[in-house]
Regions:
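N-terminal cap/lid segment of alpha/beta-hydrolase-fold proteins
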Residues: 1-24
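Short alpha-helix in the alpha/beta-hydrolase fold that links the catalytic acid
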Residues: 45, 213, 226-235
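Alpha/beta-hydrolase active-site loop
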Residues: 80-102
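Short beta-strand/loop motif that positions the catalytic acidic residue
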Residues: 211, 217-219
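Catalytic histidine-centered segment of alpha/beta-hydrolase-like enzymes
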Residues: 249-259
Length: 274
């Protein structure tokens, strides 16, 4: 396996990442979408490339502008998940796809974890040339997501109505970049990004109806069905969908990384026909 640091330019902050190539011929390309508050060197974008390159797949793992919770690079200005917009999330994946094509390679297979899975579904719905899609605990997205995750103790938790009203007021006052402390994960988020999640996150199930490529959806058995609706995704998709429930597994696949990587690689070889 050969590994190359890469950078993808945007109209604001560039996207950093790693390009992984197998030692032999490239039999397919995988574009890896990280989850919220994560990045290209943790979670599935970290543990999948060694297994996939062994099977002949090149991999692009990259940060969206909304990586981590908050960070800075060459100034005191902050960037990261606390400031991301839905438009940037979607555009960053388009730019990464274009980066792959500019290397003379074919349309990539998409593999996304959590929010990255929901974004991968949106990208597949918008780009019918995608050959295959892998959703690793993709959340449902849409306008009910924030209320649902709050009911499970995330983000605003039991202060959902209060914090939602406060975020709306800050945005209306032109203070959308102001950071708010919230009682659950993410713990810190700007008012503008909080409202983005209320209003503009892609709806996974709406995307399902527009996806034409085969899909693998994995979910841990410890994850709530209403937030990670694999069964409903299967019902709504016009294309073939394989759903696998992983025993003794939570959202981050801890202690299941090898198992998940082997499942993904095997499915890709079988479905893509490589």
């Amino acid at each position: 396996m050969r590994v190359e640091p890469i950078r993808i330019e945007t109209d604001t902050t560039p996207l950093d990442g790693l390009w992984y190539e197998p030692d032999g011929d490239i039999r397919g390309v995988v574009q890896l979408f990280h989850g919220n508050t994560m990045n290209f060197y943790v979670g599935p974008p970290r543990f999948l490339p060694p297994v996939l390159t062994d099977r002949g797949f090149a991999c692009l793992a990259y940060n969206r502008r909304g990586h981590d919770v908050a960070s800075n690079r060459d100034s005191r200005d902050l960037e990261g998940g606390a400031y991301q917009t839905a438009a940037e999330m979607i555009e960053d994946n388009v730019l990464a796809h274009r980066w792959i094509l500019d290397r003379g390679l074919d349309d990539p297979i998409l593999v996304g974890h959590s929010n990255g899975g929901t974004l991968a579904a949106r990208h597949a719905a918008d780009h019918p040339g995608i050959p295959a899609l892998v959703l690793l605990s993709a959340h449902r997205g849409g306008k009910d997501l924030m209320r649902m995750i709050a009911a499970h103790g995330l983000m605003a938790g039991d202060r959902y109505e209060e914090i939602t009203a406060h975020a709306r007021a800050l945005v209306a006052a032109g203070r959308g970049r102001e950071l708010m402390l919230v009682p659950g994960w993410w713990y810190v988020i700007s008012a503008g990004t909080y409202c983005e999640y209320l209003d503009n996150i892609p709806d996974l199930l709406d995307c399902a109806a527009r996806i034409t490529c085969p899909t693998l959806y994995l979910r841990g058995d410890e994850e709530p069905v209403e937030i990670y609706p694999a069964e409903e995704f299967v019902r709504r998709s016009p294309a073939a969908v394989d759903f696998e429930l992983i025993d003794d597994c939570g959202h981050y696949y801890l202690a299941n990384e090898d198992r998940v990587a082997t499942m993904v690689a095997g499915w890709l070889e079988a479905v893509v026909g490589l």
